[in-house]
UniProtKB/Swiss-Prot annotation:
This is Small polypeptide DEVIL 1. Residues 1-25 are annotated as: Disordered. Mostly expressed in leaves and, to a lower extent, in roots and stems. It is found in: Cell membrane. It comes from Arabidopsis thaliana. The gene is DVL1.
């Protein structure tokens, strides 16, 4: 595995780094989307509940 890392060109490393960043960003966005969905559902329940 170390040999593979040594043999990578700077362009390949840059590409891999961008992929890693986009993967983390995608995971973060998915998490936030889930939180917003839950908050929205709670708001609807609170606003629509009649006593």
């Amino acid at each position: 595995m170390e040999m593979k890392r040594v043999m990578m060109s700077s362009a390949e490393r840059s590409k891999e780094k961008k992929r890693s960043i986009s993967r983390r960003l995608g995971k973060y966005m998915k998490e936030q989307k889930g939180r917003i969905y839950i908050i929205r559902r709670c708001m609807v329940m609170l606003l629509c509940s009649h006593d």
